[in-house]
Regions:
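Conserved SAM-binding loop
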Residues: 65
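Class I S-adenosyl-L-methionine
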Residues: 152, 157-202
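Class I SAM-dependent methyltransferase "Motif I" SAM/SAH-binding loop
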Residues: 33-35
Length: 202
């Protein structure tokens, strides 16, 4: 399939585009920053009755994931090209996501770039509003310092309770990045959090 055909299967969201319509009575998961989509595809294959949103800002990555889905006959993934802050802040309906995976985002290790890190108190407030009651936030990173800081920020938010058992079903599913990292003998650190406090009514 050519690029035009692939692009017709990708939903592009900007501040000029309508909000996402998430179906009711469906278990909905989101892979935020899905990359080439190895994790996303495996998750969708494991749970064919769930709706899986694959989100990335890079069109080339989404095209590769689209090809992968066509090759394996995966039909329960929706591809979204969107910036994470806009998606979590505006486009997603409140109380619509059962589980969100944020796996190995850019750790921005240089001091002058750390303000670009996605995990922050404001991001967590927005995420809390988009998760369903008792919804799950799954985070991972290869950067030990970022991991420790992220855990601290999430704990201090008071919005989530840690429960790593909520990702026991996906411990053997890896992103393309984690697979390469593990092959070098290096670890990726995971944690899972349940929404324990509702900031807004939905």
């Amino acid at each position: 399939m050519n690029k035009e055909g692939l692009d017709r299967r990708i939903n592009i969201f900007t501040d000029m585009y309508a909000n996402i319509e998430v179906p009711e009575n469906t278990v909905v998961e989101m892979d935020l920053g899905c990359g080439k989509g190895a994790f996303t595809t495996a998750l969708a294959e494991k749970y064919p009755n769930r709706l899986i949103y694959a989100v990335d800002v890079m069109l080339g990555r989404l095209r590769k994931l689209c090809k992968r889905n066509l090759l394996y006959g995966v039909e329960n993934i929706q591809l979204l090209r969107a910036e994470a802050w806009y998606l979590i802040g505006s486009a997603l309906p409140d109380g619509s996501i059962d589980r969100l995976h944020l796996l190995c985002p850019d750790p921005w290790p240089k001091e002058k770039h750390k303000s670009n890190r996605l995990i922050s108190s404001e991001f967590l407030r927005r995420l809390n509003n988009k998760l369903k009651d008792r919804g799950v936030f799954h985070f991972s990173t290869d950067d030990k310092d970022y991991y420790r800081l992220a855990v601290k920020i999430i704990e201090e938010s008071g919005l989530f309770s840690r429960d790593d058992g909520q990702i026991a079903d996906v411990v053997d599913i890896k992103t393309d990045f984690e697979e390469r990292w593990n092959n070098q003998g290096l670890d990726v650190h995971h944690c899972a959090w349940i929404k324990s406090k509702r900031l807004f009514n939905h």
